[in-house]
């Protein structure tokens, strides 16, 4: 079995998962802790909160699996498990990218709403972008691991 640099069960993959967890949690917190009463009037903000609410537990769960795999060094690598992880990362990375793009565009349009709120929305969109890129990287590395698992 050929392992790539950040494939499932390696320490670099664990770091990717921790980064996803950190950035998705930060994005969620920046969106939720605001004092703007019109927050729920914008669908894009609610969408980003929903997506980051999905990405955070996904990343935490996989980070725990990665940590267990690194510590025990005996987690069986099955093609179906890695396929589910690749599919989940792929879907969630596109959902978070869409949420980040829509939030960033609405934040730019709402510049007259006040600097404090727009800066918070832009910061949340930036954290969502970073989480999305780490999820794309994780998808790519685990996808490269799949052919070697299929041959066994």
UniProtKB/Swiss-Prot annotation:
InterPro entries: CASP_dom, CASPL-5
Keywords: Cell membrane, Membrane, Transmembrane, Transmembrane helix
Pfam families: CASP_dom
GO cellular component, one term: plasma membrane
Cytoplasmic topological domain: 1-12, 66-80, 148-152
Domain of life: Eukaryota
Subcellular location: Cell membrane
Extracellular-facing ranges: 34-44, 102-126
Primary localization class, coarse: membrane
Membrane-protein topology: Multi-pass membrane protein
Transmembrane regions: 13-33, 45-65, 81-101, 127-147
Oligomeric form and interacting partners: Homodimer and heterodimers.
Record-stated family: Belongs to the Casparian strip membrane proteins (CASP) family.
Stated name of the protein: CASP-like protein 5C1
Organism for this UniProt entry: Arabidopsis thaliana (Mouse-ear cress)
